Amino acid sequence: MLVFNEGVPRAGKSYDAVKNHILPALKKGRRVFARLNGLRFDRIAKHLGMAENDVQHLLVLVDTKDVSKLFACTQDESGKWCIPDEFKDALVVIDEVHEFYVNERKPLAPAVENFWALLGQNGGDAVIMTQWINRLHSAVKARIEKKNTFQKLTAIGMKGRYRVTYFHTTSPGKFEKVGGQTLKYDPAIFPLYDGYAPGAENTEVYEEGGKNVWAAMAVRAAIFLTLGGVGIYFFMHYFTKDRADPNKPMASASQTTKPTHVGAGFANGAPSVPIQPPPPDPLADLTQEQRYVAQLADKGRIRLSARARVGDQDRAWIQWIDASNNVVEELDLSQLRALGYSVSVVTYGVRLSAGKHIMVATAWPWTAPIREKDARLYNMAPDGSGGAAGVATAGSDGGGADRDQVRGGVIEYGPRTQGTFPDNKGYSSSTSTPATTLQM
């Protein structure tokens, strides 16, 4: 299996490789090939409680110049790629791996690429490290199974801790987060290897040029705490200011006696009528949509206007009829359900329910308003004198009662002087041909 440690410098990549990979492998007697700065046999042997000779036999330190040619396969006589026997069941650790397998279009040498392809098949594992996985050649990156990302916690003032986020591969070069944890540095691990280059003396965490999150929040925290304290004081004072003072003398009986006659309850001209709380809203537990349907009962009487069964589904239409015999609203079952009502079709009609509110719609008889089928006839007085128009229908007396009081007239036909179309006579026309020179 190929494990990749990623993170900024001093985040804990090499620390994790030593503590969680190299030391456990040596303790189990496993061969380790490490390209890591400053590993010390004597200190590792003392830390593990092993003989220094055993550590020197198991731990092989690889120089930078030997990495590319050491970790490579060989071909047998048949041309088959074979991994050297010394790497079988071994652990390979390479720091700054991008220096040896840099990301470029040029493919790796077949011997090198086959080494990483065959290492896991021969019982070997590898831990490789760099600051950015995209600096690594794709032929090696595609074979990474686990990726661990290391993060410093100096931004929140935790110099002695670091954060590790764990990823697992889903496809070559792609990873999915599977967890993470915050760990504490073990000071006993640092002397076992060189975390800094030889001769470097400034090993403290650099803190200039910025602030951690707590320093940035200190001023805001002080302001919010002050405002919060003032707010809590006035909040508590609001509920405790009206409590009776135990040292305050009690009011006399004459001051607490209730008025017993008319007008005694008036003080400064204002009646001492107790304020009645508003009545509870019976529809308070309904939504706005449910309330709309419930309030239709104030506008009219509910009625089942039609009912049908289509296939295995019931269809029905509900109306609300007002006092003027007009339909103020009509909804079908699907609309009522959309408005939040439970609808059930029963033998006597339709039952609507929303919580504790229930309405029943039955098919009570109702006659829809019908407009008059007969045309109205208007009788007008011929001289327009003060009379009103008589209104009559085909089945009435033609407004005879009005005609008894208003003098009527007859509309007669009279010819016009110039004639009336089409009774006027047609125009007579004549044509003539003027005399020609031959006739003259």
UniProtKB/Swiss-Prot annotation:
Signal peptide: none
GO molecular function annotations of the record: ATP binding
Positions of the UniProt region annotated as Disordered: 386-405, 413-440
Biological process annotations from GO: viral extrusion
Zinc listed as a keyword: no
Membrane protein topology class: Single-pass membrane protein
Keyword tags: ATP-binding, Host membrane, Membrane, Nucleotide-binding, Transmembrane, Transmembrane helix, Viral extrusion, Viral release from host cell
Residues that coordinate or bind ATP: G7, V8, P9, R10, A11, G12, K13, S14
One Gene Ontology cellular component: host cell membrane
InterPro entries attached to this UniProt entry: P-loop_NTPase (IPR027417), Zot_N (IPR008900)
Highest taxon, organism lineage: Viruses
Function recorded in the entry: Isoform G1P plays an essential role in phage assembly. It is required to increase the number of adhesion zones between the inner and outer membranes of the host cell. The extrusion of neo-synthesized phages occurs at these adhesion sites. May be involved with G4P in creating zone through which the phage assembled and extruded. Isoform G11P is also involved in phage assembly, probably playing a structural role in the formation of the phage assembly site.
Family listed: Belongs to the inovirus G1P protein family.
Record's subunit section: Interacts with G4P; this interaction results in a complex that spans the inner an outer host membranes.
Name recorded for this polypeptide: Gene 1 protein
Regions of compositional bias (Polar residues) in chain numbering: 417-440
UniProt subcellular location: Host membrane
